[in-house]
Amino acid sequence: MKSVRFRDDGGYTRDGTWENGTIKFCGKSYEVDEVEILPPSNPSKIIATGFNYEDLIDRLDVKTPNRPRLFFKTPNTITSHNKIAEVPAGLSAVYEGEIGVIIGKQCRNVKVGEEREYIAGFTCVDDIAIAEELEDDPGAVRKSGFDTATPIGPVMASMDLVPECPDMEIRINGKVERSTNFSGQLFSMGEILAEITKYITLEPGDIFTTGTPIEPGLVSDGDIVEIYIEGIETLRHGIRLAK
């Protein structure tokens, strides 16, 4: 099943299902562009993973991590389908298509192999990052923590719908820029969850990512970014470079 949170024309927040591009709720059908699509969950925290794919590590010639390389993204970074991500003034940015893993129930000290008990489903994530090298920013607060830096959505797809290594396609203004899949992980979803929950309690709705398998691509003011992940849907958002 693909669940979707949306705001109807009466201003009410609804939890519907996404069926072939149409939203269903209580016997009514809505076209996607008729309603405001909301983030698929309201996380108290987002934990992102960097440099988790062998091909990307080889391309960028960075040191292979010995354990998942994690960093925080706070709720202010979230925006949703069909919204605008605004990059701080004077800076440029890159897109990074990723799988977002949505937690279904509170968890701590999860063991590898137990992860499916705690995962509600998957969504698309664009972990937008500042392109410039920023000094004195070891936790990526400036680089990846600015408002609207994390478009997510449009749905939460149940685990049975998403292959183990799904295909991903990224389009900019309708043109395919990247086409790849999520094979070649250094650390599996279960290993990442185990590492996070060794230290941190995750709550329902919290999200972690498994990282991007592709080299980030530069975006321009006014661009429309689309991230398709097999089994989920296509996340679409705009880019604004603040003046």
Language-model segments: residues:
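Structural signature of FAD isoalloxazine-binding scaffolds in flavoprotein oxidoreductases
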Residues: K63-H81, Y95, E226-E230
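Short acidic/polar capping segments at secondary-structure boundaries
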Residues: N52, N76-T77, G104-N109, V125-A131, ...
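Structural motif
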Residues: S44-I47, P68-L70, N76-T77, E98-G100, ...
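Solvent-exposed alpha-helices and their adjacent loops that cap or buttress functional pockets
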Residues: R7-D8, L38-S41, V62-T64, L70, ...
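Short acidic (Asp/Glu) patches
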Residues: E31-V35, T64-P65, I78-L91, D137
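N-terminal non-catalytic cap/leader segment that marks the start of a structured domain
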Residues: M1-P68, M159, R171, K175, ...
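RNA pseudouridine synthases
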Residues: E96-V125
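Catalytic-pocket segment enriched in acidic/His residues
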Residues: T17-E19, D33-P40, L56, E86, ...
